[in-house]
């Protein structure tokens, strides 16, 4: 972080005002500055430290003004080797990251340092990560569907172009795989730009994602920004803002429609809780920071559509102990346009993506936006699945034979619908040996309408498993019949 950077939104120039470290407690560092030279909140400070093996520059972000010429900062790197009396310089601007085409195909950390090709982007344009959301008169008023080619999403929980989508679910139900699939589909089908923020997740997952995207040929259209779980809380708290800043440049300067993926937004909240405790704030509900709603709002309000261009955000949200009343996921709910809940029971049935069709929601699933036919078919699918859910207790206790004839027909139809909601993913081809399917929305609506009307009640249930369209179902049925 020794290269000089510029920033296009009035962050100021490098003032190089020197202070000195007076206290170090883990990642929290108190710095004393000369009278009248106190750095502004969120300014980046640099401290040079020398370890036995290497000299390095620490980046500290100003979090509090304590009075008596003292500021409390949060370090973005481990503070090993930092001692009292170390000289600290004020850069006069916030943490800044490279923006533009130079970031595509590369991996960055929260400070904007390129990890796979050191030095990349530091000679070009830089934007500070703390920015205001777009003005009200710049927001896009039109609502448009983002067609994904994934049947269960397009039909029952349609995504809003320029909206915020939450992927809810416990550990191991497929949140990261669904995000990888969306990145692949956006790059292949729409030639769109994606920015991925890895917030507090496993380093192994980040490495796997990078290698898989390179293998799939979509890395050149994606910027990756990582602050993984082995990093200090300051980094994990800021990495989402760094990725969002890169996405904002593509939207505001290049006029592109961008997809921003955040995995995992819960770790953003968790890092904020750690920082809040380190700064001495009184904890709020369930031990979370009292500023939880404010911090979440600062991030989410910048993710929006402006006139003619958009940032659509897909956010994986870990739900602690599958408790949806936990303040972290509950606070995120208020900002979302659509929620996709991944269900463990559906995952255990071998149906992927394991989206729960009854609890997943979308604010645009109404006739005035998606159309009367789409709305009618989606509601009919939900009605049949809901009735099947109500009958499951009776089936478990008394068996299918005790049901009325019309209920037996409905149960069979519901099971076919349930299996048909799954489909093969492009990113899973090497595991399943089956090609991934992309189903147009028009075909999805027609297929589910025909299944709901009973046109395929004569086909075996297993023929519907992980199929793309009705042609795949009929082919699978013939294959089963031939055995």
UniProtKB/Swiss-Prot annotation:
It is found in: Cell membrane. It is a peripheral membrane protein. Its main location: membrane. GO terms for molecular function: ATP binding; ATP hydrolysis activity; proton-transporting ATP synthase activity, rotational mechanism. Gene3D superfamilies: 2.40.10.170, Bovine Mitochondrial F1-atpase, Atp Synthase Beta Chain, Chain D, domain 3, P-loop containing nucleotide triphosphate hydrolases. The keyword ATP-binding applies. Produces ATP from ADP in the presence of a proton gradient across the membrane. The catalytic sites are hosted primarily by the beta subunits. Belongs to the ATPase alpha/beta chains family. F-type ATPases have 2 components, CF(1) - the catalytic core - and CF(0) - the membrane proton channel. CF(1) has five subunits: alpha(3), beta(3), gamma(1), delta(1), epsilon(1). CF(0) has three main subunits: a(1), b(2) and c(9-12). The alpha and beta chains form an alternating ring which encloses part of the gamma chain. CF(1) is attached to CF(0) by a central stalk formed by the gamma and epsilon chains, while a peripheral stalk is formed by the delta and b chains. HAMAP family: ATP_synth_beta_bact (MF_01347). This is ATP synthase subunit beta.
């Amino acid at each position: 972080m020794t290269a000089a950077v510029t920033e296009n939104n009035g962050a100021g120039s490098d003032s190089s005002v020197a202070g000195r470290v007076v206290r170090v407690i883990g990642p929290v560092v108190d710095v004393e500055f000369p009278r009248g030279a106190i750095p502004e909140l969120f300014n980046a400070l640099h401290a040079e430290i020398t370890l036995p093996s290497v000299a390095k520059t620490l980046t500290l972000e100003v979090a509090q003004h304590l009075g008596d010429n003292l500021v409390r900062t949060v370090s973005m790197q481990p503070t090993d080797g930092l001692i009292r009396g170390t000289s600290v310089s004020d850069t006069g601007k916030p943490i800044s990251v490279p923006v533009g085409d130079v970031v595509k195909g590369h991996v960055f950390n929260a400070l904007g340092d390129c990890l796979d090709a050191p030095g990349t982007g530091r000679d070009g344009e830089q934007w500070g990560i703390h920015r205001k959301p777009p003005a009200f008169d710049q927001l896009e008023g039109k609502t448009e569907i983002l067609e994904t080619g994934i049947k269960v999403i397009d039909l029952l929980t349609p995504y809003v172009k320029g909206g915020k989508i939450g992927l809810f679910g416990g550990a191991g139900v497929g949140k990261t795989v669904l995000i990888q699939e969306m990145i692949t589909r956006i790059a292949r089908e729409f030639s769109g730009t994606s920015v991925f923020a890895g917030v507090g997740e496993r380093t192994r997952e980040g490495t796997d994602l990078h290698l898989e995207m390179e293998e799939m040929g979509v890395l050149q259209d994606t910027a990756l920004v990582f602050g993984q779980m082995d990093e200090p809380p300051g980094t994990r708290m800021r990495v989402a803002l760094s990725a969002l800043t890169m996405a904002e440049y593509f939207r505001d300067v290049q006029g592109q429609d961008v997809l921003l993926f955040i995995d995992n937004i819960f770790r953003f909240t968790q890092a904020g809780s750690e920082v809040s405790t380190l700064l001495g704030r009184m904890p709020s509900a369930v031990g979370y920071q009292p500023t939880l709603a404010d911090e979440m709002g600062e991030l989410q309000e910048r993710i929006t559509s402006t006139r003619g261009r958009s940032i659509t955000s897909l956010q994986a949200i870990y739900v602690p102990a599958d408790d949806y009343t936990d303040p972290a996921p509950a606070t995120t709910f208020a900002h979302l346009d659509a929620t996709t809940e991944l269900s463990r029971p559906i995952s255990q049935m071998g149906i992927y993506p394991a989206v729960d069709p009854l609890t997943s929601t979308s604010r645009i699933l109404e006739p005035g936006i998606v159309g009367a036919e789409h709305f009618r078919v989606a509601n009919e699918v939900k009605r049949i699945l809901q009735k099947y859910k109500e009958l499951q207790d009776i089936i478990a206790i008394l068996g299918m034979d005790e049901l009325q004839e019309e209920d037996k027909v409905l149960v069979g139809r519901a099971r076919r619908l349930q299996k048909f909601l799954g489909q093969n993913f492009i990113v899973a081809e090497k595991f399943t040996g089956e090609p991934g399917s992309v189903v147009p929305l028009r075909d999805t609506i027609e297929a589910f309408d025909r299944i709901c009307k009973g046109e395929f009640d004569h086909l075996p249930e297993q023929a519907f498993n992980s199929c793309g369209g009705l042609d795949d179902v009929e082919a699978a049925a013939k294959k089963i019949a031939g055995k």
